[in-house]
Amino acid sequence: MSASADSLGAAAALDKYGDEDIFSLLIRYGLYVGALFQFVCISAAVLMENNPDGQSNPESGEVTEREGEPVRTRLHKIRKLEKKKRR
């Protein structure tokens, strides 16, 4: 019986995951909460419609093409104005 008790004692000494402190519990449950938050965000991005009215917001930062003015020229003008504002 003493050989069995010694082997159980040695196995208990090698088990480093048996005792969990507050920090490891906090990390484990924090990772679960983070994974749940990521799942909710990704599912919301996939399932939600983009502008249900079909109208685009002109102040959203998107660059659209005007009549006769290509998008590239507008981007250049926007960058030039932003650079000028920084001076």
From Swiss-Prot:
Pfam families per record: UPF0239
Main location: membrane
InterPro entries for this protein: UPF0239 (IPR009621)
Compartments reported by the entry: Membrane
Protein name (record): Protein anon-73B1
Topological type in the membrane: Single-pass membrane protein
Family of this protein: Belongs to the UPF0239 family.
Extent of Basic and acidic residues compositional bias: 63-72
Chain ranges passing through the membrane: 25-47
Listed Basic residues bias regions: 73-87
Keywords: Membrane, Transmembrane, Transmembrane helix
Coiled coil regions in record: none
Region (Disordered): 51-87
GO cellular component: membrane
Signal peptide start and end residues: none
